[in-house]
Amino acid sequence: MDMLNTLRDTLSSVQAELSTGVEKLRMNVSANIVAQQKVSTESVNEILNTSAGNELLQNFQNLITEVEENGAEGGRLANLCSTRMGRCQQMCKEKADAVMEIDEFLRNSVEFDKKIREINAQISKLTRFCNQTEQAMTYLEALCEVAHTEGEVDLIRQQAKSAATIVQIECESPSVLTSALRSRPEDAVKAQQEEVMLEEFLSSKNMQLP
């Protein structure tokens, strides 16, 4: 409020001084242009030499400087806004193109349905392949288990054969000893018979001698 009052007083003083200066100019008007310019210059200088005129001129200069600064800042912001608007326009164009492509794709329902059917067929093939792979893996696991079981059975058979061989040897050993024992008395009887036959032969020879 004080600033407005001060400005009003300043304008009033300037107006009064301008009126005085104009009256002086009217009184000193001459036909010579140079004289008029001289009078005008003197009047302006006289006005500027006053405190109110000097203050008003300073205010005008400050306002002009502020207007220039605001103009430069406005130009900078305008350039920045233009750059951002260009980017926004490019982004909107890309989004619009994408939306148009989606719209065109959705409008072509036949092609869309065809692609869905192709995808379903590929999924069915993949599912069948996975099932076949699972069955093959199960079959391979069963084969591995059978091979492992057969290996264990062969090992058991070999162990059984070895045990049977050992048992057979143990069973045959007493019969061999028994046969050996049985053959010994027969050999003794045979030897005794041979001795008797030899003695009879010798005795017969002795009896035939003169």
UniProtKB/Swiss-Prot annotation:
It comes from Caenorhabditis elegans. Component of the biogenesis of lysosome-related organelles complex-1 (BLOC-1) composed at least of blos-1, blos-2, blos-4, dsbn-1, glo-2, mutd-1 and snpn-1. Interacts with snpn-1. Coiled coil: none annotated. One of its GO terms (cellular component) is BLOC complex. One of its GO terms (biological process) is endosomal transport. Belongs to the dysbindin family. It comes from the Eukaryota. Component of the biogenesis of lysosome-related organelles complex-1 (BLOC-1) involved in gut granule biogenesis. This is Dysbindin protein homolog.
